[in-house]
Each structure stands twice: as C-alpha cells, then as structure tokens.
Amino acid sequence: MDIQRVKRLLSITNDKHDEYLTEMVPLLVEFAKDECHNPFIDKDGNESIPSGVLIFVAKAAQFYMTNAGLTGRSMDTVSYNFATEIPSTILKKLNPYRKMAR
C-alpha cells in the first residue's frame, strides 16, 4: 500500500510523517490481514486492499502518530494519558472483511 494514498486520505500535505508512515503502513496492513483472516489477494494473485481496510489503515496510522489517543490530561505537574490500543470505532472498519479462522 502506497503511503502517498494514506497521506491523501488523511489530508497530509507535507513530508513530516513520511518516515513513520513508511514503517507503520505495512505493519497495519499486515495487522488487518491477520485480524480479518484474509490475505486480500484477487483472482490474479495480486494484493487488492478494499476501501474499508484502506480507511482502517489510514485512521489507525493517524491514531498512533497524533494525540488522537489522548484519554486524559492534567495541568498541575503536567500528566498525559494515552490509549495504546486501536479504538473499536476504527477496528470496526474491518468487520465486513473478516473471514472465519480455519
């Protein structure tokens, strides 16, 4: 999956996150394949990632690269809490593509 496509989906117009996305996007695609028990291979043997999975990858990358996972913040003595797991609102994008595990 091309990181430029992920950048377009997230409206990222600079190169600030390119290194991160180059590493993270393939990991998230692999996560989606494992989670769905689906290799996303078409009849010709080429990888074919459905649009919902593309959205999952983009949103999950955004979640991990920004403070989108911020769950709490204190002002006195400064304290931040972050969620470390992908939220169910993002994970549910994979539901239509899940197959039963064999």
UniProtKB/Swiss-Prot annotation:
Signal peptide: none annotated. It holds the Pfam family Phage_connect_1. InterPro entries: Gp6_gp15-like (IPR047186), Phage_gp6-like_head-tail (IPR021146), Viral_HT_Connector_Assembly (IPR053746). Keywords: Viral genome ejection through host cell envelope, Viral long flexible tail ejection system, Viral penetration into host cytoplasm, Virion, Virus entry into host cell. It is found in: Virion. Its main location: virion. One of its GO terms (cellular component) is virion component. GO terms for biological process: symbiont genome ejection through host cell envelope, long flexible tail mechanism. Head completion protein that exhibits an open central channel for viral DNA ejection. Part of the head-tail connector by binding to the portal protein and to the head completion protein 16. Homododecamer. Interacts with the stopper protein gp16. Interacts with the portal protein; this interaction occurs at the end of the packaging when the terminase complex is replaced by the connector. Belongs to the Caudoviricetes gp6/gp15 head completion protein family. This is Head completion protein gp15. The gene is 15.
